[in-house]
Amino acid sequence: MNILHVLDHSVPLFSGYSFRSRSIIHAQRALGLNPVVLTSPKHRASTDSMEDIEGIRYHRTGALAEDGAGAIPFVGELKQMLCMARRIEQVARQEKSDLIHSHSPLLNGLPALWVATRLKIPLVYEARAFWEDAAVDHGTFAEDSFRYRVSHGLETFLFKHTDHAVTICEAMRQDLQKRGVAIDDVSVVPNGVNIDEFQPIKRCKTLADKLGLNGGPVFGFVGSFYRYEGLRFIVESFPKIRAQIPNATLLLVGGGEEEQALKELAREQSGVHFTGRVPHQHVMDYYSLVDIFVCPRLRMRLTELVTPLKPLEGMAMGKAILASDVGGHKELIDDGRTGCLFAAESVDDLVSQSVRLANDPALRAKLGDAGRRFVVEERSWEKLSRRYLQLYSNALNAQREKALASVPVSEK
């Protein structure tokens, strides 16, 4: 079965989006499928029209010309979608694709719908988050603005007309049902982890010495510093944590839009380490130093609906997870068993729970063991990828039945 995955961006760019995509594609290949990839103009890391990465063909779409169109509402988006439609059809024909699997955002999904309809092949549309909500957090437009409502309406249209839809969590699936999307046409394939890659490892003493870690409990976060991650709360809380746990350390690994603001907030503090972005092959060494993996996401529509990947990676590595009680975390974490939740945006509760975990190594070990067990049993990509195999088969069978039904009785 030839599957064309349409992505916003991919490896070698590193993000939660690209890591999920990579995991899905490699797991599908292991199941005997033939996945190939097409990325949008937003992927700017490659200049070749096609490259081979880990045995997978990645087709690229060149960057759009800078002509000022992007400054006009909807014009830049329309230009990108027309470009993507041409490229999707070109690659789908070249690769003899049996099915198109488009991943959010909407700017991929609508062109994929046009092409799938034209080529008479099934389309699966997968939403990692709702594009309009992510755009609000990034400041692209305001909630309930005209652009928000248009984006919301167009994606609802897409969900209703795709052959099958996929979300990463149950909250998103329920949201689509409220929009009038048939619940049976939506499957949940949650975030997963490569459990062979992410597993408990010994502390990297060389790196600990290099960073000057003093043997006390290490609170950590590994990922992109987006505003919705709420990292300012752990930075603001840390002096209060250090007042009770003087040898505690906060290790922030990564970078992004909030990096400079966080560094300024921590400028007068002790025990806060910013590593910047680190090469992917060294990320596990930094994970090995963390005792308590902190996920202090803010409370907003995006975080209430969407389940993140990072807590699962921490669980897979046997770390104690401390996360805010937003909906996305509550769908992942069994409070007190596979992690601990604190009241979102509450410095006092974050400090209280942090001190409790820092003072109780046995509890941390218990949470880490249970978290690892949960990931191995329920969130390994080896198991999750089989859901795609079934829904692809269903979509192809439905397409064949539709084609057969359109044939006049006299010709059957």
State the predicted function of each range.
Residues 95-99, 163, 288-304, 319-320:
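Acidic donor-binding loop of glycosyltransferase active sites
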Residues 50, 199-213:
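A short helix/loop element that forms part of the nucleotide-sugar donor recognition site in Leloir-type
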Residues 1-62, 241, 400, 404, ...:
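N-terminal subdomain of nucleotide-sugar transferases
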Residues 334-336, 340-347, 356-362, 377:
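Conserved acidic donor-binding segment of nucleotide-sugar-dependent glycosyltransferases
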Residues 260-284:
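Nucleotide-activated donor-binding/catalytic signature segment of Leloir-type glycosyltransferases, i.e.
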Residues 295, 313-316, 320-323, 333:
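Short hydrophobic beta-strand element within catalytic cores of glycosyltransferases
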Residues 171, 192:
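Carbohydrate-associated surface elements
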Residues 4-6, 213-238:
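Conserved donor-binding/catalytic core segment of Leloir-type glycosyltransferases
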